Structures are given as structure tokens and as C-alpha cells.
Regions:
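Sequence-structural signature of mature extracellular/luminal beta-sheet repeat domains
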Residues: 18-256
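Sec-dependent signal peptide recognition
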Residues: 2-10
Length: 256
């Protein structure tokens, strides 16, 4: 058995049944782990199995542990949104207060990782995935935030998806979406899934050795605010409910 964490603080236990239709254990149920947040986002599982999530308008990151306890982890997050742990166990976040990618050290101090493309600030990084080789893929849509300063505008000429190599080279790898959002890759680092949420589609790509993308293929007729993947390669899409798709693009389960 293993756990899939969905919809931020709505947890469901699932079981592996190969390619059989339905992957949810017969006695599984969705439970609410916490309440009282302004707007939760960005669940990320740490190496020890704890789940970190943000309350973005409140500029906070919380952690849920194996004892089913929730504790404040940081109240200086740069308005973190999507998050992911790297191979060293450091938490990397899309911090859109100043349109940045940031990481947190072991003392919970936030550090700038990246903030500009072609001498212009990003629109507002939303979600990210870190490949096994340390490369980062992140989506950069534009959602106006009430807490942004008046001069904070949509600076980029497209709402794109970017590749940040482990040696610091940035490349825009997708430029034809209406509004990119959720993103996830396979554990072998060979395949990337990206949601165009405003177009209601998930696209699948092959990842080249240099980190660029090829072989754009339609995967699912859904937009998705966030995505994850299980050990069998099934993709979990979230927006109102959770849709589970097989690696071949077959809808195999709905969770609500």
C-alpha cells in the first residue's frame, strides 16, 4: 500500500492492481486533514514521507506528518505555490510574490534560484517538477494576485513552460499554450506531462538528453491544476475531483 496526496489536505489511500480497472482499495475513503486555510496549494512529499503544503495568500508553508499532525513550517515563503523536493532533500518552490523560483535550506531560509528570462521577470511561476538529473521544469502562466504590487504586470510575451538545467541554463520549451499549469514527469526522466488548463488538455512529451522536448502527443481531455504519478505510471489529474489515467491515456478511476 502507498498513499497518494490529492487536492491539498484531502487524503486517500490507494492500492496497486496492475492494469485492472479501478485502483482504489475497497475500504479506502477520502478524509479531510485540516481546515481554516485561505487557499491551499502545492503539496510535496519529503524524503521522510511528510507532506508539505502552502497556504498561499497567507504566505505560509505547513507540514503534515505521519502522526496526522499539521504544523507551521515557514511564514516567509515568497507566496509559494507549487513545490517539489530535490534529490538532496531541499524544498524548491514557485514563489510568485516576486515571480521567482526559490529553495529552502535546512534552516528554512529561502534563497533565490531564478527570476528572469531574457531580461524580463517571469509572469508568475505556478508548478514545477524536478527530473532525476536535477533539471527543473516549471510552468509560468499568469494569474493576477491581489497581493501583487500595482506595477506587477505580465512581462513575458507568452505563458510558457521552462527548462532550468542543473548548471543554470534556462530555456523556454513550450510556447503554444493558453495557460500552462500542472506538470509532472516520469521517475526515469524520459517523459513529461503538462496541463493547458484553459484549453482543457493534457499533453505528453519525450524529454531529449539536452532537456528539450519532442513528440508532443495529446494525452487526456482535461485541464489540471496539479498532477502526480504513481509507481505504475498512472497520472493523477486534479480540478474539482481527481481523475486517474493509465500511462496509455485511459481513464481508469475518478475520486471525489
Amino acid at each position: 500500500m502507498y498513499r497518494i496526496y490529492t487536492s491539498l489536505l484531502l487524503f486517500v489511500t490507494v492500492a496497486l492492481f496492475g492494469q485492472e480497472p479501478g485502483i482504489i482499495a475497497e475500504n479506502a475513503k477520502v478524509t479531510q486533514a485540516g481546515t481554516g486555510y485561505a487557499f491551499t496549494e502545492g503539496p510535496a512529499v519529503s524524503p521522510d514521507g511528510s507532506v508539505y503544503f502552502t497556504d498561499q495568500p497567507s504566505d505560509r508553508i505547513y507540514v503534515w506528518n505521519e502522526n496526522r499532525e499539521i504544523a507551521l513550517w515557514s511564514d516567509d515563503t515568497g507566496r509559494s505555490n507549487g513545490m517539489y523536493f530535490d534529490a538532496e532533500g531541499e524544498l524548491v518552490a514557485c514563489a510568485d510574490l516576486h515571480n521567482q523560483l526559490a529553495y529552502f535550506d535546512s534552516d528554512k531560509k529561502r534563497h533565490l534560484l531564478f527570476e528572469n528570462y531574457e531580461d524580463k521577470h517571469l509572469n508568475g511561476p505556478n508548478d514545477l517538477w524536478i527530473a532525476p538529473n536535477g533539471d527543473i521544469y516549471f510552468t509560468d502562466p499568469y494569474y493576477h494576485r491581489d497581493y501583487w504590487e500595482e506595477l506587477h504586470t505580465e512581462a513575458q510575451d507568452t505563458r510558457g513552460v521552462y527548462h532550468l538545467s542543473s548548471d543554470g541554463v534556462i530555456t523556454r520549451v513550450i510556447d503554444d499554450y493558453k495557460q500552462p499549469n500542472g506538470i509532472i514527469g516520469t521517475p526515469d526522466g524520459k517523459t513529461l506531462y503538462v496541463a493547458d488548463i484553459n484549453d482543457g488538455k493534457i499533453w505528453k512529451y519525450d524529454i531529449r538528453p539536452d532537456g528539450t522536448l519532442t513528440g508532443k502527443t495529446f494525452f487526456a481531455p482535461k485541464g489540471s491544476d496539479g498532477m502526480t504519478i504513481d509507481e505504475q505510471g498512472n497520472i493523477y489529474l486534479t480540478m474539482g475531483k481527481v481523475w486517474v489515467y493509465s500511462p496509455g491515456g485511459e481513464l481508469i478511476q475518478e475520486i471525489e
